[in-house]
Each structure stands twice: as C-alpha cells, then as structure tokens.
Amino acid sequence: MMSGEVMLVILIVIGLIGRSPIIATAASILLVLKLTALERFFPTVERRGLELGLLFLTISVLVPFASEKISWKDVTPLFTTVVGLTALAGGAIATWMNGKGLDLLRSEPHMIVGLVIGSIIGIVFFRGIPVGPLMAAGITAFVLKLWEWFGSR
C-alpha cells in the first residue's frame, strides 16, 4: 500500500472509532476509487465535491417547506420574537463562519485531518455531535483570525 491508501485506511478507522459514518464512508469511497484505478475522477470530486455536498444539505433543509410541514404561520414568529430573531442571527453567523471554514479548507486542505481528529476527541470525551468539517473549519478560521489580530498588537 502506498501512502494515499494508508491515509484513507487511517481515516476509515478514525471515522469508525469516532462514530462518524460520513468520514468512514467518504474515505471508503475514495479508497475504492483509488484501488480500482478510477483516480481520474479525483480532480472533479475535489473541484465540485463541496458544492455538491452543500447542494444536498440545502435541499434536505428545504424539504419541510416543499412538503408543507412548515407554513407561513410558522415563519412569522421568527421576525417578531426574541427567540426567532436570535435564531435568525445564529443562522446568519453560522453560515458566515461556514463560509470562512470553506475558504480555509480550500486554501489549507491538509487541515481536514486535524479537524476530523478534533471532532473525534469532541465526540469521545465531550459527548459532542459531529456536524461536519465546515463548522469546525469556520471556528478554526475565526480563532486563527483572532490569533493573528491579537498577535500583531
């Protein structure tokens, strides 16, 4: 086995130990592509994979609107209550941070390993819930920006 395969197997094991089926499945799919000489698809997956993942995530979030489980009556309190306005602000801040996380992952793709291991530590020792690398990367980008800002003073 070469280093790429070894890294993917390690990520599969980390995903299984950390109860992160998405990491384990993603690494497994990439390992199968690599072992079946379908590596030619890697550049396309690398270039469009995040966009496709975000598309499916957005579709899943919008399903309650399409299935009419959420109506206008459910939406109006968002703009008239403290809880609703706080939820709107939280969603806006979270998506902004996710965008910063995406920028960080695009410029520093090797950071995914640290984010995955950190997520596993959070799951195992703090009973956290894995929500994906974007939020972890967003928080990391925010902390790095704070470090840069305070470090330059």
From Swiss-Prot:
Query: Which key words tag this protein in UniProt?
Result: Cell membrane, Membrane, Transmembrane, Transmembrane helix
InterPro entries referenced in this protein's UniProt entry, alphabetically: UPF0756_TM (IPR007382)
Coiled-coil ranges from the UniProt annotation: none
What cellular component terms from Gene Ontology apply here?
plasma membrane
Q: Which Pfam families match?
A: DUF441
Q: How does it sit in the membrane?
A: Multi-pass membrane protein
Q: Which residues cross the membrane?
A: 6-26, 52-72, 77-97, 111-131, 132-152
Name of the protein in question: UPF0756 membrane protein BBR47_23170
Q: Does the keyword Transcription regulation apply?
A: no
Is Transmembrane set as a keyword in this record? yes
The source's superkingdom equals Bacteria
Say which family it is in. Answer: Belongs to the UPF0756 family.
- Location in the cell: Cell membrane
